[in-house]
Amino acid sequence: MSSTTVRPSVNALAAPLVEALVADAAKLRLTVTANSGEARLVNAGATVLGSIEAGRRIAEICLGGLGTVTIAPTGPVAAWPYTITVHSTDPVLACLGSQYAGWSLADEGGTSGFFALGSGPGRAAAAVEHLFEELHYKDNAVQIALVLESASAPPASVVAKVAEAAGVPLEAVTFIYAPTQSLAGSTQVVARVLEVALHKAHSVGFDLAKIVDGIGAAPLSPPHPDFIQAMGRTNDAIIYGGRVQLFVDAEDADAKGLAEALPSTTSRDHGAPFAEIFARFNGDFYAIDSHLFSPAEVVVTSVRTGHSHRSGRLVPDLVERSFA
């Protein structure tokens, strides 16, 4: 990607979505804490019920205003018909430059034990991850939003760290947080079905500049009060029920190679519900083969030739086993 290309501000595009979420907090069953001189905190499921609609909107915020997220009663997994569909005309920036949960945030030196992965457009304002050097992108934002998969609000040390890294005052930061066990939390995680395909494309070395459009769909997983089960269901929705189509400005050989490299079937750990795999590795997330974190089925279409290349397969039985 050219460093001279004018790119949109993901925080500016997401800002009206954030304000709409805050304005509709009551009907979405969220709470908002906003004190003068402090960051704004949106509780979307930690100590409130939240909602699926809140999760859908949070997913669009995570995409930096560069994508749409819809929920409809159609999809490839018949037993669980409600499907989350994600589309972006700038999938690299939307998914990797904004939605990807790549910012590790911890209460360093504190006693809270807080840790969460930050996602959303605020990442691009801080640009502390090496990924942004590869993307040649940094968002010079005046207001930022960050989404945390967390059961608690970030402590003061994390709030200060984020504001400082992004170069904005505390009151210009909005944190939206919800655990995976919640309605909103599970919804926004499944809405990463397109993002995991982009992350996999990056990890296998495909030229990201050649990815020009993308769409993904996965079944809406029911929430579960247990974190491991909830995490398992959201992963299984994508790993065994997710379908993605990428449109690439590349020749067939490259498109075919990408299609063959992307799906979760390339992983040695494919074939069991994620919670069972997690237990098999004694809860060591990083011991699991990283190739597993991919959509079940992938279609890569070359816009140069018009040919499409398909790889992987849906496994509805494992989705059913996980969701039941």
Curated annotation (Swiss-Prot):
What is this protein's function?
Catalyzes the hydrolysis of methenyl-H(4)MPT(+) to 5-formyl-H(4)MPT.
Q: Which Pfam families match?
A: MCH (PF02289)
Query: Enzyme group, top EC level?
Result: hydrolase
What keywords were assigned to this record? Cytoplasm, Hydrolase, One-carbon metabolism
- Would you name any one GO CC term? cytoplasm
Where is it localised? Cytoplasm
* Protein family per UniProt: Belongs to the MCH family.
What InterPro entries does the record point to? METHMP_CycHdrlase
Q: Does the keyword ATP-binding apply?
A: no
| Reactions it catalyzes | 5,10-methenyl-5,6,7,8-tetrahydromethanopterin + H2O = N(5)-formyl-5,6,7,8-tetrahydromethanopterin + H(+)
What this protein is called in its record is Methenyltetrahydromethanopterin cyclohydrolase
**Known EC number:** 3.5.4.27
Name the NCBIfam families for this protein: one_C_mch (TIGR03120)
Q: Where is it mainly found?
A: cytoplasm
What domain of life does the UniProt record list for this protein's source? Bacteria
Pathway note:
One-carbon metabolism; formaldehyde degradation; formate from formaldehyde (H(4)MPT route): step 3/5
Any one biological process term the GO annotation gives:
formaldehyde catabolic process
- Gene Ontology molecular-function annotations: methenyltetrahydromethanopterin cyclohydrolase activity
